[in-house]
Amino acid sequence: MRTPEEIIIRPLVTEKSTGLMADNKYTFLVDPGANKIEIKHAIEKLFNVKVLKVNTLMERGKLRRVGRFQGRQSDRKKAIVTLRPGDKIQVFEGLE
């Protein structure tokens, strides 16, 4: 059993994710091997909130070049978490 700190890597703050906060949705980068149930339990334990829904998506790493050498960024998994009305996550406060 992994700890919540191993499942949730960090909050993802972008222009789109700050717009979703108006709908009580928060975006996180999560461990690629984590499933929706693990993500839900980790968010509820870390932030003491009630999660209604979890949407996940895998984002493929982009190709990057340095001179004549080509590489690829790592793949990553995002989770968009919908909270119960009235619940807020303090990490995101002040960003709206």
Swiss-Prot record:
Keywords from the named record? Ribonucleoprotein, Ribosomal protein, RNA-binding, rRNA-binding
**GO annotation, cellular component aspect:** ribonucleoprotein complex; ribosome
Could you tell me which cysteines form disulfide bridges? none
Q: Which residues form the signal peptide?
A: none
Q: Name one GO biological process term.
A: translation
Q: Which GO terms describe its molecular function?
A: rRNA binding; structural constituent of ribosome
Coiled-coil stretches: none
How is the quaternary structure described?
Part of the 50S ribosomal subunit. Contacts protein L29, and trigger factor when it is bound to the ribosome.
- Reported function: One of the early assembly proteins it binds 23S rRNA. One of the proteins that surrounds the polypeptide exit tunnel on the outside of the ribosome. Forms the main docking site for trigger factor binding to the ribosome.
Family per similarity comment: Belongs to the universal ribosomal protein uL23 family.
What this protein is called in its record is Large ribosomal subunit protein uL23
Q: Which organism is it from?
A: Moorella thermoacetica (strain ATCC 39073 / JCM 9320)
Lineage, uppermost ranks: Bacteria, Bacillati, Bacillota, Clostridia, Moorellales
